[in-house]
Amino acid sequence: MATEVTRHIKPTIERELWARSAGRCQFDGCNKILFRSSVTNESVHTAQKAHIFSFSENGPRGWGPFKTGLNKLNDICNLMLACHECHLKIDRAPERYPADMLIDWKSKHEDRVEIVTGIASDKKSHVVMYGANIGQESSPLVFHDCVSAMFPDYYPANEKPVLLSMHSSLRDSSEGYWQAENAHLEEEFKNTIARHAKSDDCKHFSVFAFAPQPLLIKLGALLTDKLDVETFQLHREPKGWRWQAFDDDFKFIVKEPQNKTAPPALLFSLSDNVDHERVRIVLGENLSLWEVTVESPHNDFLQSKIQLVLFRQAIRKLMVDIKKHHGNATPLHIFPVMPVSCCIELGRARMPKADMDWIVYDHNPSNQKFTQSLVLSGGSNG
């Protein structure tokens, strides 16, 4: 005959369970708040104290290692806080939800709570999401994915992101696209980021963007290097926004033109090798072509935050060199073929009162050529 032990859980154990779980369901992927109604937001107690190993020998997952210490079945190590639905799941299908899986879920949930509650108050950051139409592709911007990439260095200042997005039927190859998107971005920036920077206690911004490269450069120019900004990069492998390890041998390569007396052009061959003839088709043969590249250009080379720091350093020095040879009255023609985060940081490096005009080009898929998209004036970042 099976023996049962008491279901009674000491108040001290129950309080510790609530604290460790932060009042949320510990079933992996649920995370439901258990002290407030999701419908009315009224205070309501919906939590259940679920045993990993059962208080009954014939119950789900049995007694396990507690068979020789039944008095410890109600200890904190054998309890999960769960909602009613998840409690039913784990007890009705113990084969599907074995003890080692539940212990792992409990441990990871409690570790996450400890880390989050240990983050200093100055680690708050506004999550900025900027997306625009790119050919036929849909935006990969998902708030939860962005928050995961920030963690544990920063956590969101608000439950919702700062959205800089245009719901336009225009495509980047259509007439009027650049003018419409540029004007919309300026207006949205003024109404959101500029307002937060002026009046909000939190003045840090985590930027996640996936848009045509000229618009990303414009966004960076609006942000400037005066705002406290962390720019993120969408990676293909491994997929996501989280920064990866750094290759110590990495460096950016700057190629200077032999002739520095002609009108200047700046080519970024980072995501792919770019034939210089593509630039000459647009500007002609009389030009001084500066180029920034890497040893093996490809579309997923930028994996580390340190690489982005090195890019900023290289750009600041390069802009000084270009102005030294060409002055700041001659416009600089910019041809970007590079990651989104590099585009934003290029714009942030711009000094509106000191730099020449930037004429930014984009690859037009309809004619397979670079075409002029935006002009950033020397006296402003617009």
What name fits each language-model region?
Residues 1-4, 62, 93-168, 214-226, ...:
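Defense-system signaling and execution modules centered on TIR/cGAS-STING-like, death/scaffold domains
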Residues 187-197, 307-328, 342:
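A short, acidic, amphipathic alpha-helical segment used as a generic capping/interface helix at domain edges
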Residues 3, 32-79, 90-107:
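Histidine-centered nuclease catalytic patch
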Residues 18-26, 75-79:
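Short metal-coordination and nucleic-acid-contact micro-motifs, chiefly zinc-binding Cys/His arrays
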Residues 247-318:
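Redox- and metal-dependent alpha/beta enzyme cores, enriched for Fe-S-associated oxidoreductases
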Residues 1-16, 22, 31-34:
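A boundary/linker detector
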Residues 25-30, 83:
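Short cysteine-rich clusters marking metal-coordination/redox-active sites
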Residues 87, 206-217, 269-274, 333-344:
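Gly/Ser/Thr-rich loops at beta-strand to alpha-helix junctions
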